Amino acid sequence: MGGGGMKKIVLALLLLLLPVVCGDVSVYKVWSPYDPPNSPILHVDISEQVLYLGVVNKDEYEHDVIVKVECNGKTWGSGLIPLPPNSHIEKIVEVRVPISDDKEHDAKISLIENGKTIASTTVKVRPYFPVDVKNVTCEDSYKIGNTEVCYSNWFDITLKSNPTAKSDYIAKVWINVKDGDNIIYNGKNDFKTVYIPLGEEVTVSFKVPKIVLDKEKFTVETNVEIMNVTHTIDGVEETIQRRDDSGIYYDYKSVTKYYYFPVVIKNVELYRKIDENTSEFVKNFYDSANILDDEIRDILSDKYLQKDDVLPRYYVIDDPTLAILKITVENKYDRDVKAKLTVKYDNVIFTKIINIDKKEKKDVFIPIYTKKGSKNIVVTINPIDADTLIFNRSYSINIDPKPIPPVIIEKIILPKDEEIGEETNISGYVIIGKRYNMTIFIKNIYNKTLSGKITIDDNFKDGIANYSKEIPFTIEPHQIKEINVPIIFYKEVNGDLKITVSVKGGAKDYTSLAHFYAISPIGIVRIYYNNTLLLGKINVIKENSGIYSAKPIAGFNNTCVVILRNNLNSKVDCDVWIEVIDKDGKVRAKSGIKTVKLDNYSEAKVAFPIFFEEGFEGYTVAHIIPKSVENVDIIYTEVMEST
């Protein structure tokens, strides 16, 4: 008894397991009221959303199943369906697809027995929506093909009952305004309920509060909800019923439709010219700002009035200056438009009313007053009688003004020594050892008091010139200030002084050159030895030839002659002496000092007796000390050889 009971329990368990593990149940085919089996996509009616299944049970046991349909995150389930055993005839099962829109979806169909899936298949499903969006049009627009240029914020939506419709429908309708995939106006809360008779069409109007966009065009998305299924389309569509040998089918086509703003901004850029478009802005700015920029005034006074790359310009760091924007606008509409152009920057709002001819592009020039650097400039434009259609775009404009020195050197007066002579009428022609004044006139062309310094520099060797290297200053607006710079040269030089005017916070330094030609009052024409011997000329052999040269001779009295020239047009007194130095730097002989008086532009010879104990190679050095100047030792060196 106990053993027989155990066999019955085991048999019962096997009977429960066999249908799940060994069953041969399948979904043989799937079709819809519109499409035969094996169609790539099955269409359903939104009112029924029905599919048909052919289910076959080839197993020797009966199966009791539930059909589950999963689609778009929703699930529909049937009641319990018995499938007789060894049935090679399909059982037709009607199922519903839980769809809430008219898009294409994957529908997974599963046969569930005892909580486990014993067969499944997946098909593509899409509802036939019974209403087409026949047209979407702006109430006041200029039509170009399948696009419209709008002049109103009212849109008319025409809905048409299409061939897939089975009855009249009540639809909930709303529109969205879109920029690509971005919704810029969501009208779902402003929906309207519309009655659409079978085979008829109706028109419903919607007012969009305001469209503000940084693109020239947008789309209008129409949403139609019927029986909890929402149909959405950007543009217009048409469904056509067709017949052929295989039966009835439907052709569907849709076109995206674009809507344009009536007036738009095509480009914004920094304008650098002074010409007929900008001269009035420039003149008004410089007159009101009291900036005395000679280059600007010269350009404005030029009858041709054309100069590139002069604007904007700035004088003091962190001070705002004039910049001019060239804004290119376009009227896309088929009639003339009066538009409001607005420019926003640095918490400043500038508005200008402009007239644009129909289908015209034009440049509008707008002055702005801002500091140097990258600026976010927001430009908007709309017709003044259509202020709900606003083109609005932000532009990054780099304000990179040309730096201009706020304090300039008006002029430099260089000393010119009258003793040098009338024939050298050159400023900066001076005598070494004599003190002079260089006069610098600086001018503040800006509209505020400025301070800074004048820096003077040169490329001369050390000890050639002496002057103040830095001179601080403070200068009032438009003031011309005279600054005297004492200067003295100790050696002859022909070169420039670099004069730089630097302003605290100035945009740029002003630099000028002052040329000086410093000369010695007395020049040495020649130094030579005039031996007193009858045979004073020594034959000196050099390379392949011989020459006779007057050389000093050791052990004899020699005479060194120095010829001087007065370079000035006044008398000059000077002390003269000579030294003879060998190549090792040792002084071998030194003359006494002689005072020489030279008339204007005259020459004089001065003879010095020189005696050497022995021969050597070295130099004859002449020293001339003019008595009319200070700290000047004119040195002339002549190579010599004593034999």
UniProtKB/Swiss-Prot annotation:
Entry keywords, A to Z:
Membrane, Transmembrane, Transmembrane helix
Give the GO cellular component terms, alphabetically: membrane
Name the domain of life this protein comes from. Answer: Archaea
Subcellular localization: Membrane
Q: What is this protein called?
A: Uncharacterized protein MJ0903
Primary location: membrane
Listed transmembrane segments: 9-29
Q: Does the keyword Transmembrane helix apply?
A: yes
Q: How does the protein's chain sit in the membrane according to the entry?
A: Single-pass membrane protein
